[in-house]
Amino acid sequence: MHNNNRIVITPGEPAGVGPDLVAALAQQDWPVELVVCADPALLLERARQLDLPLQLRTYQPQQPAQPQRAGTLTVLPVATAHPVVAGELNVGNSAYVVETLARACDGCLNGEFAALITGPVNKGVINDAGVPFIGHTEFFADRSGCDRVVMMLATEELRVALATTHLPLLAVPGAITRQSLHEVIRILDHDLKTKFGLAQPQIYVCGLNPHAGEGGHMGREEIDTIIPALDELRAEGITLIGPLPADTLFQPKYLQHADAVLAMYHDQGLPVLKYQGFGRAVNITLGLPFIRTSVDHGTALELAGTGTADAGSFKTALNLAIKMIINCNE
């Protein structure tokens, strides 16, 4: 286990289900200290609404970390600017959301925390406040000074990484270059080894076009870009299979051998993974100088404060982060 034995959590949008799920996480023992970067009053009020017992302890960075006991959380206080009503967005609290992300990220960068787990945010309301925000992945990459990070979603049975993330489909072909594939695949291979404990990961790669281009008859990106890039990376010792047509690759005879699949764009790979394991999937940012996992769902405003939100994805994200910490220290 990591020396500091602490994991920092950002609940995300205060009006969404993030605070509910954090309160639910607190209902069991954990082998690490859970430091929640949030408004203490928000956490206590949401726990009261859900009729969940919760005691808060103020984060003391100079004290040794302690395993988290059921019914308790450690809190790193950040105040909301306006009162929070479950289910009702308030643009005035957008700066609060960004502040929690910044503080948690900085704590990971300076070694306070072994990992960061994020709850869902509402990108629209943050941008409405005049704060440019594409997403967690891009925010943490920029704050960490990383030129390239990789988005990967994982269930127990399948890991899918993305060569491109939040781009319009029209922009995807131009964003896939030999250089970008080199960077993405090197990060993917490195983190599968160091954070997932895989000695020689097998990475299966999707083509961009239908039928992986059909020998150039349905697009030349495979011939001109993807195949040469994969050949160059194979020469470095990375195990790569493909490019294969996506509708072929996502079949058991291939997936049973795959440690990870690299999809060329967001909606090529993620629908399959989410159909297979929605609510059990974890979003992981590879290439950061720290471990970051997240839930695979949104803010679910209509469920906030009702007691009906499922904490399964949050628990899975936390358990995976703990496993990754152990792998990094072996």
Swiss-Prot record:
KW Metal-binding (keyword) present: yes
GO molecular function, one term: magnesium ion binding
Single GO cellular component term: cytoplasm
Domain of life where this protein originates: Bacteria
One biological process term in Gene Ontology: pyridoxal phosphate biosynthetic process
Subcellular location: Cytoplasm
Residue sites binding a divalent metal cation per the record: 166, 211, 266
Enzyme Commission designation: 1.1.1.262
Enzyme class per UniProt: oxidoreductase
Other comments on record: The active site is located at the dimer interface.
Primary role: Catalyzes the NAD(P)-dependent oxidation of 4-(phosphooxy)-L-threonine (HTP) into 2-amino-3-oxo-4-(phosphooxy)butyric acid which spontaneously decarboxylates to form 3-amino-2-oxopropyl phosphate (AHAP).
Protein's recorded name: 4-hydroxythreonine-4-phosphate dehydrogenase
Species whose genome carries this gene: Serratia proteamaculans (strain 568)
Name of the gene this protein is made from: pdxA
